[in-house]
């Protein structure tokens, strides 16, 4: 059997995975900033790295999986001030919501889930090491900054050079910085900020910059050199680039061996963005779709590829998952142990060992389901159920799932038909120049979570929001 190979962003290639310590894997994934509900992009990060850690454990590794929580940040402070509540009240509420969303999606809790505010001393300790090593300075405005030009390998993860970055500079000018690209390690507290947003230090009262949080938590919990660091593609630069610069300048050694990044989530082929009003929270999605369907939708795309979210694609995922459960409906699985020597299991394992290639692994499940349908073989049914379980799927009683799925499909079809009927009524109102009625129908649909977009030629498209 092939060894596990992982696409390493640092090397820009697949590499055979060899842990630093035989049989042990230490992995850190950047988690959420808890000032709002988690969105579909967060769901992808959680599902992708849940599958990664599940597969590493399946291979027999002793895994320590850390996924942090950022609970101090400018966005958090602004939201708490807007709401008139404390930082802790706000972050506790959204951490609870995060856990509810993750549990619904079948995400196994990380072994360690550190909050940034519990590691302020470690962050300050790393900043002091950077200052002692000549990589940090306190500016005239009180902020402590990282001197990017001092780190010779800056840009090695993203492939960006300092010259290219300066040529395309979009960072707001700050006369206190030695270089516009320098980034903040410790932010000086401002008089108007709430008292619960700062900590005393030798640099004055303030709070950590975002990048130093992950460096300090990773090094403290997993050691100064560990195996895997993961996160969304959007974090590759500058966040992960800055983590490398901080950590390696502080410790004098390699920070991480393998860097993994999952692809963007797109909404109807456009990048998900609040500015485009195509932004969906996990709870909005789960109000409409079964959580296992959403997990399956994410799992059957390769983690490095863009993921296009749409009602059509989710409906397709529901139908596909239904086919897998249908194969198990009338066949009782024989036994509770996976036979890894069986041909389908061997192919599944080969796919997962090829950079966690879940699309191929899922295709093996469908071939196996077809064979179960043909033979009614309890041993093959066992293989199907247990291989699905490896990636967090097919854990429910088939008839219960199928009954629920049939009901959801019927409701979805009825809703779609009702929406189309309202669109037709709106078109008729416009034709009759009753624009008040047409606007009223649009408003009613929007209140029901359906946005309309008029296209050339009199066509109207709709989507759920």
UniProtKB/Swiss-Prot annotation:
Q: Which SMART domains match?
A: DALR_2
On assembly, the entry states: Monomer.
The chemistry this enzyme catalyses reads: tRNA(Cys) + L-cysteine + ATP = L-cysteinyl-tRNA(Cys) + AMP + diphosphate
Signal peptide start-end: none
Motif 'HIGH' region is found at: 32-42
What protein name is recorded for this chain? Cysteine--tRNA ligase
**Entry similarity comment:** Belongs to the class-I aminoacyl-tRNA synthetase family.
The GO molecular function terms of this record are:
ATP binding; cysteine-tRNA ligase activity; zinc ion binding
Q: List residues binding Zn(2+).
A: 30, 214, 239, 243
Matching entries from NCBIfam families are given as: cysS
């Amino acid at each position: 059997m092939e060894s596990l190979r992982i696409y390493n962003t640092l090397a820009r290639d697949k590499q055979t995975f060899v842990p630093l310590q035989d049989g042990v894997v230490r992995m850190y994934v950047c988690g959420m900033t808890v000032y709002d509900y988690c969105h579909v992009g967060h769901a992808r990060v959680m599902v992708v790295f849940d599958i990664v850690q599940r597969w590493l454990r399946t291979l027999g590794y002793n895994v320590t999986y850390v996924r942090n929580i950022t609970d101090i940040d400018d966005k958090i402070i602004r939201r708490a001030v807007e709401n008139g509540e404390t930082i802790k009240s706000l972050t506790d509420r959204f951490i609870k919501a995060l856990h509810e969303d993750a549990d619904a999606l079948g995400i196994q809790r990380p072994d360690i889930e550190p909050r940034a505010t519990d590691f302020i001393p470690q962050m300050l300790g790393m900043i002091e090491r950077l200052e002692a090593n000549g990589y940090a300075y306190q500016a005239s405005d009180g902020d402590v900054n990282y001197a990017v030009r001092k780190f010779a390998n800056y840009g090695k993860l993203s492939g960006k050079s300092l010259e290219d970055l300066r040529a395309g500079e979009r960072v707001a000018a700050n006369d206190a910085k030695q270089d516009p690209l320098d980034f903040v390690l410790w932010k000086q507290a401002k008089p108007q900020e709430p008292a619960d947003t700062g900590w005393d230090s030798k640099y004055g009262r303030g709070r950590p910059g975002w990048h130093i949080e992950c460096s300090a938590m990773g090094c403290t919990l997993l050691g100064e050199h560990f195996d895997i660091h993961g996160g969304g593609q959007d974090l590759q630069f500058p966040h992960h680039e800055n983590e490398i610069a901080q950590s390696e300048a502080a410790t004098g050694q390699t920070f991480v061996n393998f860097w993994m990044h999952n692809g963007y989530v797109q909404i109807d082929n456009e990048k998900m963005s609040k500015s485009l009003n195509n932004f969906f929270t996990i709870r909005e999605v789960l109000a409409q779709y079964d959580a296992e369907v959403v997990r399956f939708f994410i799992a059957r795309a390769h983690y490095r590829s863009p993921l296009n979210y749409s009602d059509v694609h989710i409906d397709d995922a529901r139908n596909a998952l239904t086919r897998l459960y249908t194969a198990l409906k009338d066949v009782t699985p024989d036994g509770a142990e996976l036979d890894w020597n069986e041909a389908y299991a061997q192919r599944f394992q080969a796919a997962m060992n090829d950079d966690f290639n879940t699309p191929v692994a899922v295709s093996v499940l469908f071939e196996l389901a077809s064979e179960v349908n043909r033979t009614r073989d309890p041993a093959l049914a066992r293989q199907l159920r247990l291989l699905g379980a490896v990636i967090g799927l097919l854990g429910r009683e088939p008839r219960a799932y199928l009954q629920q799925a049939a009901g959801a499909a019927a409701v979805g079809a009825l809703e779609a038909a009702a929406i189309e009927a309202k669109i037709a009524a709106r078109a008729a109102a416009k034709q009759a120049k009753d624009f008040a009625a047409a606007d009223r129908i649009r408003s009613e649909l929007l209140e029901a979570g359906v946005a309309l977009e008029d296209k050339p030629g009199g066509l109207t498209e709709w989507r759920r929001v």
